[in-house]
Regions:
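Active-site-proximal or metal-binding-adjacent scaffold patches in catalytic folds
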Residues: 1-195, 205-246
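Walker B catalytic acidic pair
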Residues: 201
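Walker B beta-strand of ABC/ABC-like P-loop ATPase nucleotide-binding domains
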Residues: 198
Length: 246
């Protein structure tokens, strides 16, 4: 039976990459499955019943692709520990410093107008992004509801409640009960882009669907919305840092 050590010898990975590679046997698997994730690393899932030579041949053919995936995971994990953070929506930026803690997982982030000090627990690579996301959520709670309220008053469009959420695919939403949800990662977008999303949800207070009437209402509220929409579609693919997404 093929083991993790067997494939490690075949791939000849460096010590840093070995930690990102694993092999698992599954009763449900009928073929070799390759999984790549910043959280779990690169995983090879093998059927419990398999021919060793068949596995070795397939893995050998994919050696360069596997190495490429592992390299991407390694680089993505490095982005979990940024040296600086900018919130374009508000125009503020901070230099980020780290302080080691080994006995337990600390939860306090120290902030000055120009610096963030993040307690780092080295045994958990995801501890830093967890703290940074908590900090980002607090900044979003401070800014986005007030900004939405100001725009709401300006346009005479009134909502019921606003919630700041962690959302992977939606930047915002508006319900039939006039409740608005906003993605905290809007703080990482330029002001015109985050304002576009807020105007988009305010327009839904008039027209819930995306019919032509909705876009006409949005253009009334924000005449240049098309430029910001194009920018949003471009930036959302690569602008949000890994620490805010994981």
């Amino acid at each position: 039976m093929i083991t993790q050590d067997t494939l490690l010898k075949l791939l000849d990975l460096c010590k840093e990459d070995i930690e990102l590679f694993s092999v698992r046997h599954s009763n449900k698997a009928r073929r070799i499955i390759f999984k790549s994730s910043i959280r779990t690393g690169f995983e090879v899932v093998l059927p419990v019943l398999h021919e060793d030579n068949w596995v070795l041949e397939i893995v050998a053919k994919r050696k360069s692709k596997i190495e490429s995936h592992i390299s991407e995971i390694r680089e993505s994990r490095r982005e979990l520990k940024p040296q600086s953070i900018e919130l374009p929506t508000t125009g503020h930026s901070w230099r980020v410093t780290y302080k080691d803690f080994n006995d337990k997982k600390p939860v306090v982030t120290t902030e000055t107008p120009t610096t963030l000090q993040i307690p780092e627990y080295r045994e958990d690579v995801f501890h830093v992004p967890t703290l940074l996301q908590k900090w980002l959520h607090e900044r979003a709670l401070e800014y986005l509801p007030k900004r939405l309220e100001n725009l709401s008053t300006t346009h005479g469009l009134y909502y019921n409640k606003v919630r700041i959420k962690r959302q992977k695919t939606l930047w915002g939403s508006c319900s039939s009960k006039r409740n608005i949800n906003l993605n905290r990662n809007l703080m990482l977008m330029p002001l015109d882009v985050s304002d576009y999303v807020l105007h988009h949800e305010l327009a839904h207070l008039k027209v819930l669907n995306h019919s032509s009437g909705f876009w006409e209402e949005l253009e009334r509220l924000l005449p240049n919305y098309k430029d910001s929409l194009i920018k949003l579609k471009y930036l959302q693919k690569k602008h949000i840092p890994q620490w805010a997404l994981i």
